[in-house]
Amino acid sequence: MIPDLSVNFAGIKLKNPVLTASGTFGYGYELADLIPLKRLGGVVTKTVTLEPRAGNLQPRIAEVASGILNSIGLQNIGVRAFIEEPLEKLNKIGVPVIVSVAGVAVGEYVEIVKILSSQNGVSAIELNLSCPNLKKKIVCHDLPLMRDVIRGVKKVSRVPVIAKLSPLVTDISELALTAQNAGADGVTLTNTYPAMAVDIRTFKPKLSTVKGGMSGACIKPMSVRCVYDAYQDIKIPIIGCGGIMMGEDAVEFILAGATAVSVGSSSLVSPGNLIAIIDGIEDILKEKNIKSVKKIIGGINKVRNA
């Protein structure tokens, strides 16, 4: 028996639940010579902004125990250049394309999505709500602002809108519920965790910005908990993200309530891990004689309530 790995995420049909995570896979098409991109459930692009950004100064990435610390600074070519080349190349892959976008104000988010909505080949928008606004405050930490961003984008978007949320909150369920009530069609849980590291040889921070975002295996239990908590309270689907290194990790997120998963650090270390994760999910379903991955979404709740 070959299990059915297909899922429906907010109306988007995915052949399997494994997506790339924004920020570690370029725009998506660059690795076509390394792995069969057609096998992926979908591609989430690196974050696109209204105007090009050079990003932060080097060093902006550092390896730490069981993870990666980064502060890239949203380096990208800007939305207009993105639709000229990367989007066109992505559309040739044949998988859903989810475009990650970020801005410093409501109007900027709306303008980016307006431009993207005029193009074919965009399956969904992922709002990076963990970046600073004009007041240097994380967007999703300002609930009224987050509501305004989501509502504004929903008015102009022709495709589903997914809110990617920061884990640095007291109650992730409240944050996810706020996103849902503002009109989000799904949420991604979670973005990186704030962290820093110091080089004891130079007595300097390992990143030029001092602090950055932690990703990798070390954050998985915390991100799984975020997915589980949010799943109890929201009705919109969840993309689980954070520390997925193998098929077993992906299944953990799905059992906790994720409909799909996005893989970041693991694909940065070895792009082929994406394919191994897809195969790993299939192997676990075969072993358990489960016909469809859809049957295990939120499965831990069914076991607890049995």
From Swiss-Prot:
<dbReference type="GO" id="GO:0004589">
    <property type="term" value="F:dihydroorotate dehydrogenase (NAD+) activity"/>
</dbReference>
<dbReference type="InterPro" id="IPR050074">
    <property type="entry name" value="DHO_dehydrogenase"/>
</dbReference>
<feature type="binding site">
    <location>
        <begin position="242"/>
        <end position="243"/>
    </location>
    <ligand>
        <name>FMN</name>
    </ligand>
</feature>
<comment type="pathway">
    <text>Pyrimidine metabolism; UMP biosynthesis via de novo pathway; orotate from (S)-dihydroorotate (NAD(+) route): step 1/1.</text>
</comment>
<feature type="binding site">
    <location>
        <begin position="264"/>
        <end position="265"/>
    </location>
    <ligand>
        <name>FMN</name>
    </ligand>
</feature>
<keyword id="KW-0963">Cytoplasm</keyword>
<dbReference type="InterPro" id="IPR005720">
    <property type="entry name" value="Dihydroorotate_DH_cat"/>
</dbReference>
<feature type="binding site">
    <location>
        <position position="22"/>
    </location>
    <ligand>
        <name>FMN</name>
    </ligand>
</feature>
<dbReference type="InterPro" id="IPR049622">
    <property type="entry name" value="Dihydroorotate_DH_I"/>
</dbReference>
<keyword id="KW-0560">Oxidoreductase</keyword>
<comment type="function">
    <text>Catalyzes the conversion of dihydroorotate to orotate with NAD(+) as electron acceptor.</text>
</comment>
<feature type="binding site">
    <location>
        <begin position="46"/>
        <end position="47"/>
    </location>
    <ligand>
        <name>FMN</name>
    </ligand>
</feature>
<dbReference type="InterPro" id="IPR013785">
    <property type="entry name" value="Aldolase_TIM"/>
</dbReference>
<feature type="binding site">
    <location>
        <position position="128"/>
    </location>
    <ligand>
        <name>FMN</name>
    </ligand>
</feature>
<dbReference type="InterPro" id="IPR033888">
    <property type="entry name" value="DHOD_1B"/>
</dbReference>
<feature type="binding site">
    <location>
        <begin position="70"/>
        <end position="74"/>
    </location>
    <ligand>
        <name>substrate</name>
    </ligand>
</feature>
<feature type="binding site">
    <location>
        <begin position="191"/>
        <end position="192"/>
    </location>
    <ligand>
        <name>substrate</name>
    </ligand>
</feature>
<comment type="similarity">
    <text>Belongs to the dihydroorotate dehydrogenase family. Type 1 subfamily.</text>
</comment>
<keyword id="KW-0288">FMN</keyword>
<keyword id="KW-0285">Flavoprotein</keyword>
<feature type="binding site">
    <location>
        <position position="128"/>
    </location>
    <ligand>
        <name>substrate</name>
    </ligand>
</feature>
<dbReference type="Pfam" id="PF01180">
    <property type="entry name" value="DHO_dh"/>
</dbReference>
<dbReference type="GO" id="GO:0006207">
    <property type="term" value="P:'de novo' pyrimidine nucleobase biosynthetic process"/>
</dbReference>
<protein>
    <recommendedName>
        <fullName>Dihydroorotate dehydrogenase B (NAD(+)), catalytic subunit</fullName>
        <ecNumber>1.3.1.14</ecNumber>
    </recommendedName>
</protein>
<dbReference type="GO" id="GO:0005737">
    <property type="term" value="C:cytoplasm"/>
</dbReference>
<feature type="binding site">
    <location>
        <position position="164"/>
    </location>
    <ligand>
        <name>FMN</name>
    </ligand>
</feature>
<dbReference type="GO" id="GO:0044205">
    <property type="term" value="P:'de novo' UMP biosynthetic process"/>
</dbReference>
<feature type="active site" description="Nucleophile">
    <location>
        <position position="131"/>
    </location>
</feature>
<dbReference type="InterPro" id="IPR024920">
    <property type="entry name" value="Dihydroorotate_DH_1"/>
</dbReference>
<keyword id="KW-0520">NAD</keyword>
<feature type="binding site">
    <location>
        <position position="46"/>
    </location>
    <ligand>
        <name>substrate</name>
    </ligand>
</feature>
<comment type="subunit">
    <text>Heterotetramer of 2 PyrK and 2 PyrD type B subunits.</text>
</comment>
<feature type="binding site">
    <location>
        <position position="216"/>
    </location>
    <ligand>
        <name>FMN</name>
    </ligand>
</feature>
<keyword id="KW-0665">Pyrimidine biosynthesis</keyword>
<dbReference type="InterPro" id="IPR012135">
    <property type="entry name" value="Dihydroorotate_DH_1_2"/>
</dbReference>
<dbReference type="InterPro" id="IPR001295">
    <property type="entry name" value="Dihydroorotate_DH_CS"/>
</dbReference>
